[in-house]
Each structure stands twice: as structure tokens, then as C-alpha cells.
């Protein structure tokens, strides 16, 4: 079974993962989100500099976690697009350098394909075969904030004095010949993140686009509404926390393209109108704080409910029309518990199965890119040309460059 190294640097998260087939051997993630927080959004130059700082240490940590050396790697997968070109360039350059120096084939893969297939990775959180070790920000002198995922197993954590990072030490790895192949089932995939909101169809190992956002992505809407409310970046977790104590039925916000739409927009999304409607309510409260009805918690809950309603209703409708029995959800917005809950409830009514990756795999990470590379290698795709370049826009029809 081939062992694939995955590198992810499409936005503000740096990820290095290692998989063998569908088995996660390592997954190291660092985020520069704390550096962007004062600006209320991602600053491309800051993100790119953070990737340069994080990537060497994460590569070292991933190999150590997997108990491998670079010569054990059979293929390198790296996000080639879509994303911020300055950020993508860091990962692509690193992958090319590794590939050239070791003679290992390099696959420049589509970021969205990584999200789509991440749900088909084994449940490494329960079987001791892998790890998500997430560092929300790494400063030049060490860790600013460590948000590692929890595990049912007890393992040791030690400090690497050279990199000044925490290193997860797992149990001894299984041999590559007992790992399973990536088995990607026919399904409808909902991808929702800060940069993308789209519905995909996987059929016979091919991915096609059913619909996408016509304006703002769902995650982008969360960030913008959070900014209007005076909440911290990133907005998704902040709004979800606020919404937990609010009434989701307090305000009837619009659900664009949900009941009245043209046929070609049946599976498309639009969140700009919802964003405007929420903004008006927030501004009304700010202008008259003595009469703050509805409460800010109710606004957050009602906004979240509207987003969940649109995303899940269209996804279930697409699955029923596509004659598949499986729905997959990925992307950072898939970490929202209310959206996950509503999708599972609606799918169950129609007898549909739902696969959602562990929350740590919903956000950008290297394991999902390694998984995409593993899948594409299984399907017989050729490595990318040595001169390939990262691109900000990459159609789904182009799974590898």
C-alpha cells in the first residue's frame, strides 16, 4: 500500500498529513488565525509568511508521528488550487523541492477534492491509528495556543527542543500492507467553508458540480455577520456559541433560492440577501440599545438556523434527485453542530446515510490532501508536470494538475 504525504497551504492553515490508503498515519495542523484576528479576516501576506515558518516543523512532526522517514514516502500530494496564490505557492514549492530531492512523484491536487474524500478516511480517532494534532497558532518562540483533539487512548506528549513544539507520540504503527484502499462511494457532497459553498456528485469515481453559491460562501457569511455583531474572527465558532443560548425562531430571516428558483439554480446557494437582512436588524439594535429586541443571541440563532435550513434542504433534495443513498459533508462549516444535526435529521427521514468527518478533519488539513492523492493514485492518474503552478481558481473537472 502506497504511503502518501499531503501538504495543505491554501489559506491560513498549514497542514502536513500522511496516509496509507484510507488510514491516517499522521496529521499536523497549525493555524495563523490569531495573527489575522486584529484585521477581522485573512491577510494573504501574513498567511504566506506563517506557512513558511510552520511547514518545516510540521513536516518533521508528521514523519515522527508516523514513525517514518522521507524515503518511505511513495507520493506527495499538495494543494494546487483553489486558494490564495501566495499561500499555495509555499506548499507547492515545498512539495516540488521534496519531490525533486527524493525522486518522489508530486500530485498537485484540487483542494475541494480533498474535502470531498476526507469523509472516507478511517475513523482514526477511535482505533489508535492516527492523530489530529492541531495548533491554532505557533509563535516564533513556541505554541501560542494548542487545541489538540481528544482521544480515547492515552498517549505521551513530549517537547521537541529543536522546534519548540509539542510532539504527539502514538503507539507503534501498523504495517502498510494491512492498510485499506480508499473506497469512495457514490454520493452527494455538501462542501461549505469560508471560501466555498457547493454541492457535488461523486459517481463512478468522478466528481461533478451540481450547484454552488452565487455570491457569498456560507463561512464567509458567518464571518461577516460576526464582524457586524462585534464578535471575534473566525466568526463561525463565535456565532455558534452565541446561538446556543438564543431562540432560532425569534427572527424569520430569508431563505434565498429555497422555494422559488429557476431550474438551473435548483442546487445553487445565495447568502448575500440573508447577510443584508441580519445586518439591518443588528444596526437597528445598535441605534437603539435600550430596546434591544430581539436579543443578539436570538439573532445569532436565527441566522444560523436559516443557513442550516438552506444548506441541508438543498443537499437532501440533490441526493434524492441523484438516486444516491449517501450524503457527505465537508469544509469548515461542517464543524457547526446545528448544521450537522439538521442534516442528519432530514437525511434519516428519507432513509439516507450521512458521513461527516471528525470536526478536526472538516477544516483544512494535510490528511485530506494526502487522501486525495491516495485516491487519485489508485485511479491511475499521472503525477503533475514539474512546472505546474498554483492557481486561485481551479474547476472541479480538474482533480489534479
Curated annotation (Swiss-Prot):
Its cofactor is Fe(2+). It is an enzyme of class 2 (transferase). Belongs to the KAE1 / TsaD family. Required for the formation of a threonylcarbamoyl group on adenosine at position 37 (t(6)A37) in tRNAs that read codons beginning with adenine. Is involved in the transfer of the threonylcarbamoyl moiety of threonylcarbamoyl-AMP (TC-AMP) to the N6 group of A37, together with TsaE and TsaB. TsaD likely plays a direct catalytic role in this reaction. Substrate binds at residues 191-195, 223, 236, 336. Binds 1 Fe(2+) ion per subunit. The keyword Transmembrane does not apply. It is found in: Cytoplasm. One of its GO terms (molecular function) is iron ion binding. This is tRNA N6-adenosine threonylcarbamoyltransferase. HAMAP family: TsaD.
Amino acid at each position: 500500500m502506497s504511503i502518501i504525504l499531503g501538504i495543505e497551504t491554501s489559506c491560513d492553515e498549514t497542514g502536513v498529513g500522511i496516509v496509507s490508503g484510507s488510514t491516517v498515519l499522521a496529521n499536523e495542523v497549525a493555524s495563523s488565525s490569531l495573527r489575522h484576528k486584529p484585521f477581522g479576516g485573512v491577510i494573504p501576506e501574513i498567511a504566506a509568511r506563517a506557512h513558511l515558518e510552520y511547514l518545516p516543523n510540521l513536516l518533521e512532526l508528521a514523519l515522527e508521528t508516523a514513525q517514518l522517514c522521507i524515503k518511505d514516502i511513495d507520493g506527495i500530494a499538495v494543494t494546487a488550487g483553489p486558494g490564495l496564490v501566495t499561500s499555495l505557492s509555499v506548499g507547492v514549492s515545498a512539495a516540488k523541492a521534496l519531490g525533486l530531492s527524493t525522486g518522489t512523484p508530486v500530485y498537485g491536487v484540487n483542494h475541494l477534492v480533498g474535502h470531498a474524500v476526507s469523509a472516507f478516511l478511517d475513523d482514526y480517532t477511535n482505533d489508535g491509528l492516527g492523530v489530529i494534532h492541531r495548533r491554532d497558532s505557533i509563535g516564533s518562540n513556541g505554541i501560542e495556543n494548542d487545541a489538540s483533539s481528544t482521544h480515547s487512548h492515552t498517549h505521551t506528549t513530549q517537547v521537541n527542543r529543536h522546534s519548540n513544539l509539542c510532539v504527539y507520540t502514538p503507539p507503534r504503527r501498523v504495517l502498510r500492507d494491512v492498510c485499506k484502499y480508499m473506497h469512495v462511494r457514490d454520493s452527494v457532497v455538501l462542501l461549505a467553508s469560508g471560501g466555498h459553498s457547493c454541492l457535488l456528485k461523486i459517481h463512478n469515481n468522478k466528481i461533478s458540480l451540481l450547484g454552488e453559491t452565487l455570491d457569498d460562501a456560507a463561512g464567509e457569511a458567518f464571518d461577516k455577520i460576526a464582524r457586524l455583531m462585534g464578535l471575534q474572527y473566525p466568526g463561525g465558532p463565535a456565532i455558534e456559541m452565541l446561538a446556543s443560548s438564543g431562540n432560532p425562531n425569534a427572527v424569520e430571516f430569508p431563505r434565498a433560492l429555497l422555494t422559488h428558483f429557476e431550474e438551473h439554480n435548483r442546487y445553487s446557494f445565495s447568502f448575500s440577501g440573508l447577510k443584508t437582512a441580519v445586518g439591518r436588524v443588528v444596526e437597528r439594535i445598535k441605534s437603539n440599545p435600550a430596546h434591544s429586541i430581539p436579543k443578539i443571541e436570538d439573532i445569532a440563532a436565527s441566522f444560523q438556523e436559516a443557513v442550516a435550513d438552506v444548506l441541508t434542504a438543498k443537499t437532501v433534495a440533490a441526493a434524492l434527485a441523484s438516486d444516491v443513498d449517501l450524503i457527505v459533508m465537508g469544509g469548515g462549516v461542517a464543524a457547526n453542530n446545528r448544521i450537522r444535526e439538521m442534516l442528519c435529521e432530514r437525511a434519516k427521514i428519507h432513509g439516507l446515510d450521512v458521513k461527516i468527518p471528525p470536526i478536526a478533519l472538516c477544516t483544512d488539513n494535510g490528511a485530506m490532501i494526502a487522501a486525495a492523492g491516495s485516491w487519485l493514485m489508485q485511479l491511475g492518474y499521472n503525477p503533475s508536470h514539474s512546472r505546474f503552478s498554483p492557481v486561485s481558481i481551479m474547476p472541479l473537472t480538474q482533480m489534479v494538475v
